[in-house]
UniProtKB/Swiss-Prot annotation:
Record keywords, A-Z: Amino-acid biosynthesis, Aromatic amino acid biosynthesis, Isomerase, Tryptophan biosynthesis
Catalyzed reactions: N-(5-phospho-beta-D-ribosyl)anthranilate = 1-(2-carboxyphenylamino)-1-deoxy-D-ribulose 5-phosphate
Annotated InterPro entries: Aldolase_TIM, PRAI_dom, RibuloseP-bd_barrel, TrpF_fam
Name the UniProt record assigns to this protein: N-(5'-phosphoribosyl)anthranilate isomerase
HAMAP family: PRAI
EC number of this enzyme: 5.3.1.24
GO BP annotations listed: L-tryptophan biosynthetic process
Pathway: Amino-acid biosynthesis; L-tryptophan biosynthesis; L-tryptophan from chorismate: step 3/5
KW Amino-acid biosynthesis (keyword) present: yes
Family: Belongs to the TrpF family.
GO molecular function terms listed in the Swiss-Prot or TrEMBL record: phosphoribosylanthranilate isomerase activity
Protein's gene: trpF
Keyword Nucleotidyltransferase applies: no
Length: 206
């Protein structure tokens, strides 16, 4: 049985958040990036969070957001953790009085160990698939052999995960956590409760 943590990202509906919690997800993610088909506004996020049971971490995903925009969201949405998924510098990620993680889009030749040292203040590093011009949610997996055995930070593995491949991903990479969005959807931004349940079952059995 696996102790790997899990996050269901791109939540836009209360029923999907509750399905994730019921299936045993440790965290749910809200995308505050207007260009994403999974984007939510503060009203949606607040309404969903208000219905959550305890012990489900709420994560806000941001892509090159201004400090002003981010602070305005944090004033009204009770987020536990921030996820920076753009070209943010370490300085851009600090100063919000919230723990944070940094997403890196993995390409051959990238020095992931150096990147982890650069983002020293991050609680973890999320590794995602590199697709030019697309900051995340690609639905494509990357070459997991590019991940070093030790990175010095908890690894959150993302990119094209589903119930069909997450067991293999966990066995190969041995991440702290896995992050899924498209792999548990019936349409972009609309989750499928059965797929969430199957994904969580595969994680626990890995």
């Amino acid at each position: 049985m696996s102790n790997v943590r899990s996050k269901i990202c791109g939540i836009t509906r209360i029923e999907d958040a509750l399905a994730a919690a019921e299936a045993g997800a440790d965290a749910i993610g809200f995308v505050f990036y207007a260009k994403s088909p999974r984007a939510v506004d503060v009203r949606q996020a607040r309404a969903i969070i208000a219905e959550l049971p305890p012990f489900v971490t709420t994560v806000g995903l941001f892509v090159n957001a201004s400090r002003c925009e981010l602070n305005e969201i944090l004033e009204v949405v009770p987020l536990d953790l921030l996820q920076f998924h753009g070209d943010e510098t370490p300085q851009d990620c600090e100063g919000y009085h919230r723990p944070w993680i940094k997403a890196l889009r993995v390409r051959p030749g990238d020095d992931l160990e150096a990147a982890c040292r650069l983002y020293a203040g991050a609680r973890g590093i999320l590794l995602d698939t590199y697709v030019p011009g697309v900051p995340g949610g690609t639905g494509e997996a990357f070459d997991w052999s590019l991940v070093p055995a030790r990175l010095g930070k908890p690894i959150i593995l993302a990119g094209g995960l589903s119930a069909d491949n997450v067991g293999q991903a966990i066995a190969q990479v041995k991440p702290y956590a896995v992050d899924v969005s498209g792999g548990v959807e019936q349409a972009k931004g609309i989750k499928d409760a059965a797929k969430i349940e199957a994904f969580m079952r595969a994680v626990k059995q890995a």
